[in-house]
């Protein structure tokens, strides 16, 4: 665990996180490492503290998406847990995250033992999160400001890739940067809802794909950096 629990957190928010874990179990999340990370990470700290209202903090451990600024949101805890579970993270995995946002998913990946490379196109979020996560103790993450569609070819290949915004299609650059045997989890769709796509790379030309459930994400925009 990277986060040092305060007395206030121990008596208030830690209990809320435990209840959230039970809710996620009821919704089908079974990976014990994912559930442990959810119980550990102080989600209530990932909102903009300059604008966060008491009512918003009250819902920090509800299964809701909430605004974090720059027109972006922190995803539902179930969505974060679902994507993380589908990645099948192993300790030491090199993971590319598209869309750092407030860093909650990023922290999940680190708690799972991953070596994280994270890209964010919103400069204000990039500037904030690259300081905030190390402050919480997550000091091994490599942060990048840029276009997620292009990935990070200079640091490829990756064991796993997770995309935290809804894309109209699966960018070929990301598929090229995935190791053989690796997994990419990405929501696809241009409407209000997207379908979660889970692809395993069997060879340089062959992928095994699953489409699982509908989710709601902010759009993944190209050439907007």
Label each region the model flagged.
Residues 86-208:
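Conserved nucleotide-cofactor-binding alpha/beta core module
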Residues 2-96, 104, 112, 125-127, ...:
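Class I SAM-dependent transferase core
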């Amino acid at each position: 665990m990277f986060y040092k629990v305060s007395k206030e957190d121990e008596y208030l928010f830690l209990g809320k996180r435990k209840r959230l874990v039970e809710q996620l179990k009821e919704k089908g999340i079974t990976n014990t490492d994912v559930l442990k990370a959810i119980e550990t990470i102080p989600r209530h700290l990932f909102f903009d503290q300059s604008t966060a209202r008491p009512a918003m903090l009250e819902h920090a451990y509800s299964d809701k998406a909430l605004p974090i600024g720059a027109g972006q949101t922190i995803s539902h805890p179930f969505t974060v847990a679902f994507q993380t579970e589908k990645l099948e993270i192993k300790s030491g995995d090199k993971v590319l995250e598209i869309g750092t946002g407030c860093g909650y998913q990023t922290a999940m990946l680190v708690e799972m033992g991953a070596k994280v490379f994270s890209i964010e196109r919103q400069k204000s979020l990039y500037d904030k999160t690259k300081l905030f996560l190390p402050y919480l103790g997550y000091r091994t993450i490599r942060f990048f400001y840029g276009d997620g569609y292009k990935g990070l070819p200079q640091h490829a290949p990756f064991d796993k890739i997770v995309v935290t915004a809804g894309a109209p299609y699966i960018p070929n650059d990301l598929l090229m940067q995935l190791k053989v045997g690796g997994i990419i989890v990405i929501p696809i769709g241009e409407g209000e809802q997207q379908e979660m796509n889970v692809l395993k790379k069997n060879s340089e030309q062959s992928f095994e794909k699953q489409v699982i459930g509908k989710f709601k994400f902010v759009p993944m925009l190209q050439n907007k950096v």
